[in-house]
Amino acid sequence: MSDPIRTKPKSSMQIDNAPTPHNTPASVLNPSYLKNGNPVRAQAQEQDDKIGTINEEDILANQPLLLQSIQDRLGSLVGQDSGYVGGLPKNVKEKLLSLKTLQSELFEVEKEFQVEMFELENKFLQKYKPIWEQRSRIISGQEQPKPEQIAKGQEIVESLNETELLVDEEEKAQNDSEEEQVKGIPSFWLTALENLPIVCDTITDRDAEVLEYLQDIGLEYLTDGRPGFKLLFRFDSSANPFFTNDILCKTYFYQKELGYSGDFIYDHAEGCEISWKDNAHNVTVDLEMRKQRNKTTKQVRTIEKITPIESFFNFFDPPKIQNEDQDEELEEDLEERLALDYSIGEQLKDKLIPRAVDWFTGAALEFEFEEDEEEADEDEDEEEDDDHGLEDDDGESAEEQDDFAGRPEQAPECKQS
């Protein structure tokens, strides 16, 4: 629903893959070779045959300063106006201006579409909530699953071949009274979070102890006229020895104006203050006790040295942009942290909360890997297509061209997703 985070200030943004007016067509400036052929190619080929082929890669590899200079010059040309648009006739420019007006009207319609989509998502969120609430009660042990739910679940896992969840005949015959009754599903949300790739690396051993008391993760959409969403982490405060909060929340805000692609753009996030019971239970800091002796009185006192450390619970204290004049390396580090923070929020909203049981069992990982493999295959296909295109530009032997002569033209293959 939203664009990836814009990590660069607007002043430094450039258009990727600039459209044709920024890269002037060769046919506009020079006579085309398509009909007349390249007048110097045959002569150059004869000279190459006489003196041998120069390997440009070897030359550049042996002269890194030259290579860097070329790269810098090429980089400065990206997005530069070639003058093509400026040289167009007046009546063509007027037509382009009218197209700009029409495009601005399209932006308004797209904004209306996104706003209504947001309202539709919020409408269906109200239908999700009763289901999520029952899920939460079963996880925490406040409610027992109904027999028909168990039977339906058995059919589902059989169809998906998730054999680990199947209850065999011996287990069915076992008397519930003979089996130790476990309240709810222990470590449900901790296990689900640790199976989500983008989150697992942020959870330390100390974090895991705290997340044992996590009872539910909820979602709300903002309805105060500004697009965004809120994640709510509900803890068992009566048993939690680490902090007193019942709920930890994280709110993500989108910009009011749409991005160029017609989607909402991430603006910023706001966390909440965690009321740790004491520094010893605060998993976001490292506590070191030091003894200090007074030189005059010779009295000894104990002081605490507190050092901030990496922790999942830093998620509730999101990174903030301090000023525009900060060091470039610090700016890049901040951008990476902002991008990671935004990605975690989106994946919790779009992946973890709707499919929590599959992240607990690990079944969701199989679908995740399948999607990654499909994307990798598509990237490889595109690279192969590009390679074939380059080969065609270099020219083919007469024998290869004759192989295709006289064959009926085949229809392009349809890719199915």
Curated annotation (Swiss-Prot):
Composition-biased stretches (Basic and acidic residues): 404-417
Consequences of knocking out this gene: Exhibits a large proportion of multinucleate cells. Elongated buds. The percentage of elongated buds is significantly increased when GIN4 or CKI1 is also deleted. Small decrease in the percentage of cells with elongated buds is observed in NAP1 and CKA2 double mutant. NAP1 and CKI1 double mutant exhibits increased sensitivity to benomyl. Increased resistance to benomyl in NAP1 and CKA2 double mutant.
Cross-link (Glycyl lysine isopeptide (Lys-Gly) (interchain with G-Cter in ubiquitin)): 50
Modification sites for Phosphothreonine: 20, 24, 53
Recorded consequence of changing residue 177 to A: Significant reduction in phosphorylation. Complete inhibition of phosphorylation. Leads to a prolonged S phase and a shortened passage through G1. Predominantly cytoplasmic
Annotated family: Belongs to the nucleosome assembly protein (NAP) family.
Protein name, entry field: Nucleosome assembly protein
Source organism of this protein record: Saccharomyces cerevisiae (strain ATCC 204508 / S288c) (Baker's yeast)
Originating gene: NAP1
